[in-house]
């Protein structure tokens, strides 16, 4: 059975015209995470943010179920497998809510995904997906 999570990055700019603020995502280690089909398997990606002013970052996923990072992978037949996502590098591990961050030359973030459901012989084979969205507001 193949399980994967596709990472999509979006930057949202909300800056003033008088001063051109700069904020960018750099050093993305992987745009697609692949989990093995074993219980508690993990996958992670990291990236850095450089901003010349204070900013906010928001993490969300297509299948997010709560603010603590519970989500699920889904296959083409809508069968679901639960996952848990965690953020490190931010001032909080909060999902679907902007997290204020100070201006920095480089702030490293890591998103870790863990399979929280044990696949069995009865688990339908297929490609299981979720999408992660990262928004920068500056």
Question: What does each model-identified segment do?
Answer:
Residues 7-8, 18:
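Cleavable N-terminal signal peptides
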Residues 1-5:
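Positively charged n-region of N-terminal signal peptides that target proteins for export
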Residues 62-98:
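Surface-exposed binding patches on compact interaction domains or structured appendages
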Residues 19-75, 101-138:
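N-terminal small/polar-rich segments of proteins
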Residues 13-17:
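N-terminal signal peptide c-region/cleavage motif recognized by signal peptidases
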Residues 9-11, 137:
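Extended rod-forming repeat segments used as scaffolds/tethers
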């Amino acid at each position: 059975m193949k399980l994967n999570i596709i990472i999509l990055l979006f930057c949202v700019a909300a800056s003033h015209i008088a001063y051109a603020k700069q904020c960018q995502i750099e050093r993305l280690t992987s745009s697609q995470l692949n989990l093995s089909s074993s219980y508690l398997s993990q996958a992670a990606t990291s990236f850095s943010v450089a901003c010349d002013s204070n900013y906010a970052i928001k993490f969300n996923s297509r299948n997010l179920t709560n603010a603590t990072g519970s989500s699920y992978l889904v296959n083409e037949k809508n069968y679901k497998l639960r996952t848990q996502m965690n953020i490190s590098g931010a001032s909080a591990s909060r999902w679907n809510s902007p997290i204020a961050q100070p201006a920095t030359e480089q702030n490293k973030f890591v998103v870790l995904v863990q399979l929280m459901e044990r696949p069995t012989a009865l688990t339908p084979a297929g490609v299981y997906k979720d999408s992660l969205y990262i928004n920068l507001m500056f």
